[in-house]
């Protein structure tokens, strides 16, 4: 009974080490806060004019998002497929034998009518076979902010979208680097043109929790389980 109690207590303690997905994801994360246009840093000139060259655009200039705070719409078209297979097979056999001990006169030595001899054998084998197939796809749109313009002109973009539904919340987060040449005239860019892209799509709430295993199941499936 004592061993059962100790095992149960140890299971509860170790289960706390098993992390849950999206437990630290919250809305209004400052990291994904909107970036607003930089303030005008031009020195004020007392000429009586209200014209601001920083916020102005040439009549024939390209209207692409190229400044901090501008908005770019990302066209999500992501698709991945992966497969993996592994097979392992080992076999080992060993035998050891001691013939009957021969005594004086060339006769086997007997103890209690039985001759002295020894024999042992062992046989061990292992077979393992595993296969894994995974495919994912993501399509949709998300508008993000230009957070920074690098010296070479590339744009650091970042943003998120939250959807509050009856059974929970869903969110998309995206960040990466974009070349100005890849931004179209209507300020859109394909997701496969984003360098160092970090795209996260998940959710919180009853629907997401229903797809997650319980803490005890996660413990027995984790590396903490010794068997």
Swiss-Prot record:
Example of a GO biological process term: bacterial-type flagellum-dependent cell motility
Main location class: membrane
Entry's Gene Ontology molecular function annotations: cytoskeletal motor activity
Coiled-coil spans in chain: none
Family: Belongs to the FlgH family.
Keywords: Bacterial flagellum, Cell outer membrane, Lipoprotein, Membrane, Palmitate, Signal
One GO CC term, this protein: bacterial-type flagellum basal body, distal rod, L ring
Lipid attachment residues per UniProt (N-palmitoyl cysteine): 17
Subunit structure: The basal body constitutes a major portion of the flagellar organelle and consists of four rings (L,P,S, and M) mounted on a central rod.
Stated name of the protein: Flagellar L-ring protein
Pfam families to which the protein is assigned, alphabetical: FlgH
Keyword Lyase: no
Domain of life where this protein originates: Bacteria
Signal peptide: 1-16
Residue positions bearing lipid (S-diacylglycerol cysteine): 17
Summary of the function given for this chain in its UniProt record: Assembles around the rod to form the L-ring and probably protects the motor/basal body from shearing forces during rotation.
HAMAP family: FlgH (MF_00415)
PROSITE patterns in the record: PROKAR_LIPOPROTEIN (PS51257)
Provenance organism: Pseudoalteromonas translucida (strain TAC 125)
Topology of the protein relative to the lipid bilayer: Lipid-anchor
Subcellular location per the Swiss-Prot or TrEMBL entry: Cell outer membrane; Bacterial flagellum basal body
């Amino acid at each position: 009974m004592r061993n059962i109690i100790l095992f149960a207590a140890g299971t509860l303690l170790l289960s706390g080490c098993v992390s849950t997905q999206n437990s630290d994801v919250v809305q209004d994360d400052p990291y994904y806060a909107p970036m607003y246009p930089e303030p005008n840093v031009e020195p004020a000139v007392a000429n009586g004019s209200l014209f601001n060259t920083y916020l102005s655009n040439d009549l024939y200039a390209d209207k692409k998002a190229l400044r901090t705070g501008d908005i770019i719409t990302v066209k999500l078209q992501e698709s991945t497929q992966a497969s993996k297979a592994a097979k392992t097979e080992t076999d080992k056999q060993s035998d050891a034998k001691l013939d009957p001990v021969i005594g004086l006169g060339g006769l086997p030595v007997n103890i209690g009518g039985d001759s002295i001899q020894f024999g042992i054998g062992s046989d061990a084998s292992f077979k393992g076979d595993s296969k894994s197939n995974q495919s994912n796809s993501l399509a949709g749109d998300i508008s993000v902010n230009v957070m920074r313009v690098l010296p070479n002109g590339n744009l650091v973009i970042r943003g998120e979208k939250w959807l509050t539904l009856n059974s929970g919340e869903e969110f998309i987060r995206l960040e990466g680097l974009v070349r100005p040449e890849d931004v179209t005239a209507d300020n859109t860019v394909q997701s496969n043109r984003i360098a160092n892209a970090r795209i996260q799509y998940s959710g919180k709430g009853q629907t997401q929790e229903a797809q997650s295993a319980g803490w005890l199941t996660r413990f027995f499936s984790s590396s903490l389980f010794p068997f």
